Amino acid sequence: MELEWDEAKRLANVQKHGLDFAEVSSLDWDNATFLEDARRKYSEPRFWAFAMKGPWLHVVTFCLRGAKVRVISFRKANDREVKRHGPKAT
């Protein structure tokens, strides 16, 4: 998977969430849950991936640009998201 991102956004994400966009490639993508972010009309479709990294569920907001995954946000999942999308969710 080829990743891309805005460098200023990556630095802001590290500051806010302590997670670097470069770590997104180490998520368990094979077992991820994907949802479209339809909260508003964006200029291009956005998606959420809920995937494990170690013992923690993480959330990646991204869009697709050709064959590349453009990372928009990367953070640990909140309690509600863990219940809904975590490994023990049904």
What are these regions (language model features)?
Residues M1-T90:
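Ribonuclease/tRNase effector modules and their secretory precursors
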